[in-house]
Regions:
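Hydrophobic alpha-helical membrane-insertion segments
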Residues: 37-54, 172-183, 376, 380-388, ...
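Short hydrophobic alpha-helical membrane-embedded segments
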Residues: 9-12, 92, 113-122, 308-312
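Transmembrane helix-loop-helix hairpins at membrane boundaries of multipass inner-membrane proteins
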Residues: 1-5, 19-103, 107-117, 192, ...
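Cytoplasmic/organellar membrane-interface segments at the starts of transmembrane helices
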Residues: 373-375, 433-497
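Central hydrophobic cores of alpha-helical transmembrane segments in multi-pass inner-membrane proteins
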Residues: 7-22, 36-49, 93-105, 122-124, ...
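Cytoplasmic juxtamembrane regions at transmembrane-helix boundaries
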Residues: 103-118, 245, 253, 442, ...
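Hydrophobic transmembrane alpha-helices and their helix-loop junctions in integral membrane proteins
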Residues: 100-106, 124-136, 149-438
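Alpha-helical transmembrane segments and their helix-start/interface "positive-inside/aromatic belt" motifs
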Residues: 29-40, 163-173, 373-378, 457-465
Length: 497
């Protein structure tokens, strides 16, 4: 039997959380180093898996590093893990951000033990979603994620943290209830929870209990809440605004990607003909999300809230790539998820650092901080320009591939029109990003901020590591797209694109 990479990657953070939970109070330094250890190991293992991943043509559509053990025989449910070209980049991204948020949290002093327990449990739950090949196991990991995110926002957040955390839970549970109904409908119709077996055969066997269209939309709405898609988006700005910085980075960087991943893996894989039939409607929602998110962003005065609404717009690009339904657009959507995770994760990290060092988040009161915080200003500018699609950054590569694929789609009537409308969102994005950078870091220097400190050595390490990855993917996107295509090609074949 081969080495169980995925079990170790998924559960090492949980092991770390359990060990930290057993500690008594007052050992903050040791707790931090343990958190580094138990997030570094999954990252190392995920990079090893990435390096030995079979990229040959024969591996197209093949789940690699599979582990399968009978779990609940009465339901034909299994502990079944595996990754393909779609999920492996998401695993590496989550493991990387898991380590980054530990460094971001280095100066956290409130209930440190509980804080890192929840942070590590959050990482395990997200990794579990991206590696599960059994729908029940997938759902369990999906639900577990709610608990640590709730506590991270409600205890270590700011502002209306209790309201935002409860709103997050209610929205997520609403989506989860619909998703569970869809999963149970699939199970009672097919007798299997195996995502590999269902992919490609779903429409042939999903007919008797309820219409396939109904199951498709039950699952789709559950995923759309998490992505989020307008009109299911209103929890996101509140959660981001009031979450601690580490929570915002994981939320934007990895957690909302679960929604896009679920749509591609489950909705498109099992219901390709339904996806084709309703693609124009869903592309309309994508364009609405892009334009609405960008337009509302222009009116924000809170630093983190502005970045949160930009995420709504960028997830619209993901939805556009998904429901253009061809191989290029789907590859672009998957790359956009990774790119957005790096870029917006970095934006939230820099926003949190700015708010922490300056003590102010109102954009009307900020300005001229580039003199006091040159490193933060440079990194924030790179992340911001990457978000609007600056060449040599991951944002440009992801948006270009997504738009090229969507514009050339022959499966969806009016795809070029939807694409052109979505490109308007990039123009609006340039407006709010450039205004944000100018407002926070340039303009008149304010005397009250003369004593503000720049990023310290540890902060510069993770800042520039993220910048390096953003530039690497931007200059050489094939490092990811060559793998992503192996997972996307079979889906595109099912869809006819």
């Amino acid at each position: 039997m081969s080495f169980p990479y995925l079990t170790w990657i998924v559960f090492l953070p949980l092991v770390g959380a359990i060990i930290i939970a057993l500690f008594s109070g007052g050992r903050e330094k040791l707790i931090r180093y343990l958190a580094v250890l138990f997030t570094s190991l999954p990252l190392i293992l995920s990079l090893v898996a990435f390096s030995v991943f079979d990229r040959s043509a024969a591996a197209t559509g093949v789940m690699q590093f599979q582990e399968k053990i009978s779990w609940i025989p009465a339901m034909n449910a299994n502990y079944h893990l595996g990754v393909d070209g779609l999920s492996l980049p998401m695993v590496v991204l989550t493991a990387f951000l898991g380590l980054v948020v530990v460094f971001i949290s280095w100066k956290e002093h409130l209930r440190v033990r509980e804080y890192f327990v929840w942070l590590l449990l959050l990482e395990t739950s997200i990794l579990g979603v991206f590696t599960s090949l059994d729908l029940l196991l997938f759902f369990v990991f999906w639900e577990v994620e709610i608990i640590p995110m709730y506590f991270l926002i409600s205890i270590w957040g700011s502002g209306r943290k209790e309201y935002s955390s409860i709103k997050y839970v209610l929205y997520t549970l609403f989506g989860s209830a619909l998703m569970l109904a869809g999963i149970l409908s699939l199970y009672f119709t097919t007798g299997t929870l195996n995502m590999v077996e269902l992919a490609g055969n779903g429409m042939a066997i999903v007919q008797s209990v309820m219409p396939a269209v109904a199951i498709f939309f039950l699952l789709l709405i559950g995923f759309a809440v998490k992505l989020p898609v307008v009109p299911f988006h209103t929890w996101l700005p509140d959660a981001h605004t009031d979450a601690p910085t580490a929570g915002s980075v994981m939320l934007a960087g990895a957690l909302i990607k679960m929604g896009g991943y679920g749509i591609i893996r489950v909705c498109l894989g099992i219901f390709p003909s339904v996806a084709r039939d309703y693609a124009p409607f869903l592309l309309t929602l994508a364009v609405i999300s892009v334009l609405y998110g960008a337009a509302v962003t222009l009116r924000q005065t809170d630093l983190k809230r502005l970045i949160a609404y930009s995420s709504v717009s960028h997830m619209g690009f993901v939805l556009l790539g998904i429901f253009a339904l061809n191989e290029v657009s789907l590859t672009g959507a998957a790359l956009q998820m990774v790119s957005h995770g790096l870029l917006t994760g970095l934006l939230f990290a820099m926003a949190g650092l700015t708010i922490h060092n300056v003590g102010e988040r109102d954009l009307r009161k900020l300005g001229g901080l580039a003199r006091q915080m040159p490193a933060v200003a440079v990194v924030f500018s790179i992340a911001g320009l990457g978000s609007l699609g600056l060449p040599t950054t991951s944002g440009f590569a992801a948006e270009f591939i997504t738009f090229a694929g969507a514009f050339s789609s022959t499966l969806v009537a009016g795809a070029p029109v939807f694409t052109i409308l979505a490109v308007i969102g990039v123009v609006l994005g340039a407006g709010y990003i450039l205004w944000l950078i100018q407002r926070v870091f340039y303009g008149p220097v304010k005397e009250e901020y003369n004593a503000v400190k720049d990023a310290d050595g540890l902060e510069k390490i993770y800042m520039f590591a993220m910048v390096a990855l953003i530039m690497l993917v931007g200059i050489y996107p094939a490092i990811l797209t060559d793998i992503i295509k192996l997972g996307i090609a079979p889906l595109a074949g099912l869809l006819g694109g």
